[in-house]
């Protein structure tokens, strides 16, 4: 206990909550990820239950299957991200999610809907690439404060979007998933700005922005 109480981190984290401009890609991807995930968490289950009369207890079982698959695939996803890089990993995720969300909008088969539900969750596992991208570009002293802000940003979308899309759902449930596909498409475009080798001073592929984004 004495050793633990005297432990000091090598890096002193900044306590003020400040989001630096050079982390703007990370911030936007985090915000979009929060909204995208809520469409899956809330409305994919609604689709199974309301459109296909899928028993609620079976939805719970699918959630457990997803958890088991995630546990098994997580190390493999991590190795894949290390091998192909964050931009390619996120590209794979977002292209997959666009296909899944568009398919949700028009699916007529319960078997296909269940397969989409499982694929949807697995693609979200690749979102860890957003965090590894941030770790590569961040000043170590900024990590704690910026992570706290990103948590808040993620949850702003998580709180606001389900309420708004709930109204859309009543009118046309397909529109909800097409909006989700649009969000995934925006994320796809944004992820293309991630460099092959992200690091401090090389946070984006945009030209002539390195100096301004340092602020």
Predicted features and spans:
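Hydrophobic core of transmembrane alpha-helices in multi-pass small-molecule transporters
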Residues: 111-125
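Helix-to-loop junctions at the C-terminal end of transmembrane segments
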Residues: 73-85, 169
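Loop-to-transmembrane helix entry/capping segments in MFS-fold secondary transporters
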Residues: 23, 56-57, 140-150
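Transmembrane alpha-helix termini and helix-breaking/packing motifs in multi-pass membrane transporters
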Residues: 46, 50, 160-176
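Multi-pass alpha-helical transporter architecture, strongest
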Residues: 1-5, 181-213
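Intracellular juxtamembrane helix-capping segments at the cytosolic ends
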Residues: 125-138
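Structural signature of the two symmetry-related core transmembrane helices
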Residues: 88-103, 181
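Short amphipathic helix-loop junctions that connect adjacent transmembrane helices
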Residues: 42-59
């Amino acid at each position: 206990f004495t050793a633990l109480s005297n432990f000091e981190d090598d890096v002193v984290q900044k306590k003020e909550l400040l989001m630096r401009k050079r982390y703007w890609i990370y911030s936007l991807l985090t915000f979009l990820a929060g909204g995208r995930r809520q469409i899956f968490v809330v409305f994919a289950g609604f689709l199974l239950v309301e459109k296909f009369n899928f028993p609620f207890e079976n939805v719970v079982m699918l959630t457990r299957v997803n958890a088991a698959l995630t546990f098994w695939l997580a190390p493999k996803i991590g190795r894949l991200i290390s091998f192909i890089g964050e931009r390619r990993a996120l590209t794979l995720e977002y292209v997959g999610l666009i296909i899944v969300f568009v398919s949700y909008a028009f699916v007529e088969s319960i078997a296909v809907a269940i397969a989409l539900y499982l694929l949807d969750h697995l693609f979200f596992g690749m979102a860890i690439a957003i965090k590894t991208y941030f770790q590569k570009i961040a000043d170590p002293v900024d990590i704690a404060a910026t992570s706290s802000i990103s948590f808040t940003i993620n949850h702003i979308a998580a709180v606001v979007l389900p309420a708004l899309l709930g109204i859309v759902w009543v009118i046309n449930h397909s529109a909800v998933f097409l909006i989700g596909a649009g969000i995934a498409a925006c994320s796809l475009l944004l992820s293309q700005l991630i460099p092959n080798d992200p690091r401090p001073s090389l946070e984006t592929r945009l030209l002539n922005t390195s100096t301004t984004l340092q602020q």
